[in-house]
Amino acid sequence: MNLHEYQGKQLFAEYGLPVSKGIACDTPKEAVAAADEIGGDGWVVKAQVHAGGRGKAGGVKLVKSKEEIREFAEKWLGKNLVTYQTDENGQPVSKILVESLTDIDQELYLGAVVDRGSRRIVFMASTEGGVEIEKVAEETPEKILKAEIDPLVGAQPYQGRELAFKLGLEGKQIGQFTKIFLGLAKLFEECDLALVEINPLVITPAGDLHCLDAKVGVDGNALYRQKKIHEMHDPSQEDSREAEAAKWELNYVALEGNIGCMVNGAGLAMGTMDIIKLSGGQPANFLDVGGGATKERVSEAFKIILSDDAVQAVLVNIFGGIVRCDMIAEGIIGAVKEVGVKVPVVVRLEGNNAELGTKVLAESGLNIIAATSLADAAEQVVKAAGGK
């Protein structure tokens, strides 16, 4: 689960990190009032969406008057912001962050992720702040400094100082950076984060370090014990189908093809998408109904898949292990009847009660195409969707 910048900065402040004074606003009137409360003669206004590249898309602006703030808020509130990280529809803007201006002498980068290879939290720092860290990693990987956090002892002050020295910091900046490093590590662990970035972490003309941006991603599997953070969830930033799928504990990711996929198991789902692609088709989604699929979840999965108008055929690929194929077959029949499926449905069943499941489908009287193998299923569904 991702957080908005203003929410991330609220957490930063709670953990002692230096952030700008800012107010998240819902209306142009609130945005103008926020400028009065913050004070000064210049501000930064930022559209709040779960995507990078806002500045290049016009979603971040330095303003010198309250009239400019009002115009910016009127331009973006209730509209969609399209950046290089969004799809062509963009993401809706429901809040504008109004912040005090911060003068910048230098931009740095500081972030942390869970490294699956080392099974540890890894901090990354770089002198190349203000640009995409992925670009830095690709073009000049030697400019990215790393520090692994030992899970037994946690982040240590010496690691912060070591990174600070390598970044070329000096004097009071060493202590400031170490404090930010330790605060960020504590936040990462206590709030079950999956990713956190400060880009840029700036040095002001006075020589102080300041967190100018906040990108925070929370481990969705830990939200049950992060009630406060869970309340920050903004479903408007997610694909509506993905949000609906999450309610039913379905793993759904929208894609851009025309062949809907319903599979049990993430690995089998990825393999199914691969073979559709190899057969000349384009998957419309990734959908894993899981090992504990029920008739109700299968029915909801169909509804979600068919809510995508681009879908011209559906492939159901089930390997019966924990879940019985005959139960899945009953769910498919119920869903086809309830939803009124108008597109071709190709079903491949293998494993637990596969023969019984195939028999149930055959006796249903519905227009469901039974496949004899995964390769056959892919060929059938591509053909049904109008492919080769």
Swiss-Prot record:
Catalysed reactions, as listed in the record: succinate + ATP + CoA = succinyl-CoA + ADP + phosphate; GTP + succinate + CoA = succinyl-CoA + GDP + phosphate
Start and end residues of each ATP-grasp domain: 9-244
Domain of life: Bacteria
Pathway: Carbohydrate metabolism; tricarboxylic acid cycle; succinate from succinyl-CoA (ligase route): step 1/1
Residues that, per the record, bind ATP: 46, 53-55, 99, 102, 107
GO molecular function, one term: ATP binding
Record's GO cellular component terms: cytosol; succinate-CoA ligase complex
EC number from the UniProt entry: 6.2.1.5
Keywords: ATP-binding, Ligase, Magnesium, Metal-binding, Nucleotide-binding, Tricarboxylic acid cycle
Pfam families in the record: ATP-grasp_2, Ligase_CoA
Residues the entry annotates as binding Mg(2+): 199, 213
Spans traversing the lipid bilayer: none
Positions of substrate binding: 264, 321-323
Cofactor stoichiometry and binding remark: Binds 1 Mg(2+) ion per subunit.
Names of the cofactor(s): Mg(2+)
Quaternary structure annotation from Swiss-Prot or TrEMBL: Heterotetramer of two alpha and two beta subunits.
Protein family membership: Belongs to the succinate/malate CoA ligase beta subunit family.
Role played: Succinyl-CoA synthetase functions in the citric acid cycle (TCA), coupling the hydrolysis of succinyl-CoA to the synthesis of either ATP or GTP and thus represents the only step of substrate-level phosphorylation in the TCA. The beta subunit provides nucleotide specificity of the enzyme and binds the substrate succinate, while the binding sites for coenzyme A and phosphate are found in the alpha subunit.
HAMAP family on file: Succ_CoA_beta (MF_00558)
Protein name per Swiss-Prot or TrEMBL: Succinate--CoA ligase [ADP-forming] subunit beta
Source species of the chain: Marinobacter nauticus (strain ATCC 700491 / DSM 11845 / VT8)
Gene behind the chain: sucC
